């Protein structure tokens, strides 16, 4: 881990784990046979992530350990499972859906027989993470203008999958600051996140938009649904759900503020 991976609450930021998963996934492909190395070089796209955060991790010079395996293989996609450990403690469970992509023709393709055969050597089906319920974003929702930075773009020429989590986070912080507030003594933890990638995001000067609404309000928790979109064309680039838990029970004022952006109240 890096010092820059820490957030304002003194532990590894939830979005940093997505970067760790990517590093492990790339290392897996590059350390395999030339066939899987070429799979990475010719193009692979992430289509979804699921992350379950089990333990906050503080900064340490002890490295985190990521166990990785292939947990499903289809005709034109495969999924990778992960467990991230802090010492002996399981900190994060995750799953990534991946599809092969032909960068030359700019289109999806099927896995070849050699690719399937080599991926199957790492096949170890595990108990899946239950998907968080998907809800459509209501017309009345929190809006956050999103500026893509030049450094957000990866070697494939579009915004890297990790950055989407940063974008969802920036919008979430804006909404939370407007509702429950970020008091020094308050601790809010992301415990679960699902994200689907629908279209690549390109660099441009004009802002995109992240829309966020509250789908569930509990005693100490709330769930947010979000979309990254183009406000001009209404094109949707990604959808996400995030579960946030606090150490204290939500106050009446906080619940009322969250309800202002609630899906159920519309």
Indicate residue ranges for each PLM-predicted region.
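Hot-dog-fold acyl-thioester-processing enzymes
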Residues: 1-48, 93, 99-192, 247-266
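Short structured motifs
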Residues: 47-54, 65-66, 192-198, 209-211
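Preference for bulky hydrophobic residues occupying beta-strand positions
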Residues: 1, 51, 68, 82, ...
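Sequence-level detector for tyrosine residue identity
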Residues: 17-20, 53, 59, 82-85, ...
């Amino acid at each position: 881990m890096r010092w820059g991976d820490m957030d304002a609450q003194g532990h590894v930021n939830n979005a940093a784990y997505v970067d760790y998963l990517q590093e492990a996934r790339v290392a897996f492909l590059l350390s395999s046979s030339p066939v899987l190395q070429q799979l990475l070089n010719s193009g692979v796209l992430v289509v979804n992530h699921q992350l379950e955060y089990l333990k906050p991790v503080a900064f340490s010079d002890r490295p985190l350990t990521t166990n990785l395996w292939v947990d499903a293989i289809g005709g034109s996609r495969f999924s990778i499972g992960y467990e991230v450990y802090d010492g002996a403690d399981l900190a994060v469970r995750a799953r990534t859906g991946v599809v092969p992509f032909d960068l030359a023709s700019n289109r999806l393709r099927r896995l070849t027989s050699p690719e399937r055969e080599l991926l199957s050597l790492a096949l170890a089906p595990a108990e899946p993470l239950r998907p968080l319920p998907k809800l459509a974003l209501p017309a009345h929702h929190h809006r956050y203008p999103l500026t893509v930075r030049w450094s957000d773009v990866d070697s494939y020429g579009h915004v890297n999958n990790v950055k989407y989590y940063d974008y969802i986070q920036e919008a979430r912080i804006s909404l939370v600051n407007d509702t429950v507030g970020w008091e020094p003594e308050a601790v809010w933890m992301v415990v679960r996140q699902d994200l689907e990638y629908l279209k690549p995001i390109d660099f441009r000067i004009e802002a995109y938009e992240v829309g966020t609404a509250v789908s569930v309000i509990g005693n100490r928790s709330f769930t947010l649904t979000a979309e990254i979109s183009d406000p001009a064309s209404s094109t949707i680039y990604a959808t996400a759900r995030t579960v946030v838990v606090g150490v204290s029970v939500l106050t009446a004022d906080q619940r009322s503020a969250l309800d202002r952006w609630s899906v159920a109240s519309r």
